[in-house]
Amino acid sequence: FFDFDEWALVLGVLGDKDAEGIIDALAPVVTRVFTTQPESPRASDAEALADLVELRGLVVSAHPASDDAMDTARRWAAEGDRRAVLIAGSVVLAGEAIAYAESEGWKA
């Protein structure tokens, strides 16, 4: 069980997945969304994902490069107490996040 007051979401989805379903499932628990495009030819466009998120009334910004999305989300989390970042939408993005976190020396 995690006890954070605010959650940000880094979201990158492959085009054949249910992006709207993922957004609808996570929207009630996130404060901010950073959309991105995983390194895959099947990746959904970060701007198109941001448009879907915006329709749900959430604060969102698009970051085509996943490392930029993760850095921006991490800075957002550091600006307040009890903030956390969730990375979701694609196993490809999860792999990129693990590799990037290791290269940056981030703790889990």
Which residues does each PLM region occupy?
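Short helix-capping segments at alpha-helix termini
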Residues: 2-6, 54-58, 105-106
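Generic beta-sheet signal
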Residues: 7-9, 83-87
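Alpha-helix N-cap/loop-to-helix initiation residues
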Residues: 15-19, 42, 94
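C-terminal helical cap/extension that packs against the catalytic core
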Residues: 20-84
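Active-site-proximal loop/hinge segments that shape catalytic or ion-binding/gating pockets
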Residues: 90
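Active-site-adjacent alpha-helix immediately C-terminal to a catalytic or transition-state-stabilizing loop
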Residues: 95-108
